[in-house]
Amino acid sequence: RPSTGPRPGRPRTGCPSRAPPRGGGGGARAAPAPQPGVSDLPALVEQMREAGLPARLATEGEPRALPAGVDLAAYRLVQEGLTNSLRHAGARARAEVTLRYGPRELEVGVADDGRGAAQEELSGTSGHGLVGIRERVALYGGILSVGPLAGGGFEVRAKFPLKDGQ
């Protein structure tokens, strides 16, 4: 019996397809979505408020363009810090995000007045969030401090070095 097309389970070979390419053709790919940065922090803080965490953003110094990696790392630190506050700080906790532009560094932090964190969270054995933040901060030459606050609550804070003009 003569073949009338490719057999099931076998790729078609030999004859080029006459059908237009899938996805609109032309070979053009969609541009990747831009990475978030510190300019997106007001929207992130608002999302956390809507999710039930009273949060505010305080900015000190003159905002300026940051190296892309530092910009993303700072955003991710705040995202992780606020997410942890929402999950672990307790029903009545509040969070504050601080962003300080210094002449040669960017300092970014999240502090809450909640319950704090369990030791396994601090050591990085109960998830990957803080481990990922440690790695991102180190990648850009920053210094990370994570831990309970003296009066209760918890803080995640990083300082990223900036070159002149950044």
Please place each PLM-identified region on the residue numbering.
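Glycine-rich ATP/GTP-binding catalytic cores of kinases/NTPases
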Residues: P2-Q166
